[in-house]
Amino acid sequence: MGTPNPRTWSELPPDLLGSIFHRLSFTDFHRAKIVCWNWNLSSKLTVPKKIRSPWLMLFPEGDNEDGSVLLFNPEEEEKIYKTKRYFSGIRFLANSGKWFLLIDSLFNLYIIDVFSENKIDLLPLEESLLDKEESEDLTGLLWVDEKTAEYVVVLFFNFPSGNVGFCKKGDDHYTKIPLHCGVPWRLQGLIDAVLLGYRLYIRTELSYIRILDLSTQQGFEDVNKYEPFQVFSSTQDCSIAVTTRGEVLLVKSILDNTTIGSHRRFCIFKNIDYNPQEEVDSLGDEALLLNLGILLPSIAPNSIYFTRHGRIYHKEHFNLDLCVFNLETKTLKRFPSLANMKLKDAQWFFPGI
């Protein structure tokens, strides 16, 4: 039997390729479309299987010889995928859907689609924003519109005493956001933030909520139309989240340690400018990705997807807890296949956005 001609794979007829693509999982679909030009063209005529659940991006500890990171789909608990891209010396700062914000060892910033070769180079970092000796403290938030390719990048430099800057598609510089100088005392500082579209929601040092519109031509605009409201919280293990309607929620995490293990539970509150607050017992048909602070449609509605606290403050040591909490049944799900993995970090993301 002769050796198969490798060219024949790229010359398969479109109808046969379409039949193949229809049978592939979401991950294999995106792998297949970068095999060659013809496969990529055929993939555009095929609708991939719909993603119904958030995924985990896993970052292993220690030396990673091939520079890859791992992908975990909760619907396929026994499968862990490895990216084909080379990510040695690169830090993942934030994500929006399948797009991730990265910084490399030369301090270059860019956005990538983890399932394709698509890449967006960002503006060079300005010395006035970043002290490169403290670049390990750089964190960020990202929003990408899949339909229009518009994007917003928010960067947090050298916290807790540092700067905030942002850029959006078409900008030729980073715009600084003052946190103290010229800012009313209740709206000064930052301990938590959520980016939803062009709006940045900041929880200030005194736990007031500051809302910024980043879409203006002049840079940004404070849009607190009413008296800014204060978040009442007696615990540090809490985060803000924002609904699709722009309502700010407070999410509290409580870890109960016992002799037989630990159990984590969550409480969500709305009308958070009042005391006592109103507890939320349902998220409708949406789920909360707490590392992003936003709600999305999901196969598991009323669920909270959790990895760790601290979106903004980068810490060398923190406790990862990869779990999903059902708000209705008050039950917690962890993943046995990940229990023995040594990870330095993990992020939930939603490939289907």
Swiss-Prot record:
Domain F-box per the UniProt entry, residue ranges: 6-58
Tree of life domain: Eukaryota
Entry-linked Pfam families: Beta-prop_KIB1-4 (PF03478), F-box (PF00646)
Annotated disulfide bonds: none
Coiled coil: none
SUPFAM superfamilies on file: F-box domain
Cited InterPro entries: F-box-like_dom_sf, F-box_BR-signaling, F-box_dom, KIB1-4_b-propeller
Name recorded for this polypeptide: F-box protein At2g14290
